[in-house]
Amino acid sequence: MIEGLLGRKIGMTQVFDPTGQVIPVTIIEVGPCVVTQIRTKERDGYEAVQIGYQEVRAKSLTKPEQGHLRGAGKLLRHLREFRTDNIADHKVGDVLTVEMFAPGQRVDVIGTSKGRGFQGVVKRHGFGGGPRTHGQSDRLRAPGSIGAGTDPGHLWKNTRMAGRMGNQRVTVQNLTVVDVVPERNLLLVRGSVPGANNGLVMVRRAIKGS
C-alpha cells in the first residue's frame, strides 16, 4: 500500500473536542486519486506507484499526456509518484480515497509555500536591522557587513541576503488527523499546512510519527 495521496487545501476553521477545547484545523480535500502507472525495478530501476488527481478536459492536456493516461481511464491534471515495496497491491486504474487515513493518525503534509516576491533580509531572514539613531540613516533594514575585512575576504556561498521569498516546497510533519469525512473526501488535520487555499498538497503517513 502506498503511503500517501494528493489533494488540495480548502482552508482553515476550528472544531471542538469532547471537553469543549477549541482545535484549529485545516480542511484538505484528499483524492479520489487514480493509479496511472506502476514503476518496476526491471523496467525503471526502482519500484513506485504513480497516482493522478483532479480530472480535466482533454483540451487541457497534450496528446502524449492523454496517451499516458489512457490505461487509467481518466484524464488527470496532477501526477506524483510514491515509492513502495508492495507494487503488487496496486494496478493501473485503481481508485484510492481518503479512507486510508483515520482520526488520531499522524501525517506529513507537503505543499508549495506562498510566493512573497523579492524581499529584504528583515522579512526574509528575520534580521534585526541597523541602529535607529546616533546619526544613522538608511540603515534601518540593511543587512550590514557581508564579509569585507574578514579572512578570507570574499563572499561565502549561501550568505543570507535579500532575494525571492517563498514559492518553495515545504513539508510540515506530524500533524494529527482530527476527522475524516469520506463522503466528501475531506481530511481535517490539526494546525496549518503550507500554501494558499486551493493549492495542491501531498498527504502521507508520518515518517517520524509514532
UniProtKB/Swiss-Prot annotation:
GO biological process, one term: translation
Keywords noted in UniProt: Ribonucleoprotein, Ribosomal protein, RNA-binding, rRNA-binding
Cleaved signal peptide residues: none
Gene Ontology MF: a single term: structural constituent of ribosome
GO cellular component: cytosolic large ribosomal subunit
A matching Pfam family: Ribosomal_L3
Region (Disordered): 125-151
Alphabetized InterPro entries for the sequence: Ribosomal_uL3 (IPR000597), Ribosomal_uL3_bac/org-type (IPR019927), Ribosomal_uL3_CS (IPR019926), Transl_B-barrel_sf (IPR009000)
Sequence similarity: Belongs to the universal ribosomal protein uL3 family.
Summary of the function given for this chain in its UniProt record: One of the primary rRNA binding proteins, it binds directly near the 3'-end of the 23S rRNA, where it nucleates assembly of the 50S subunit.
Assembly description: Part of the 50S ribosomal subunit. Forms a cluster with proteins L14 and L19.
The protein, known as: Large ribosomal subunit protein uL3
Gene from which the chain derives: rplC
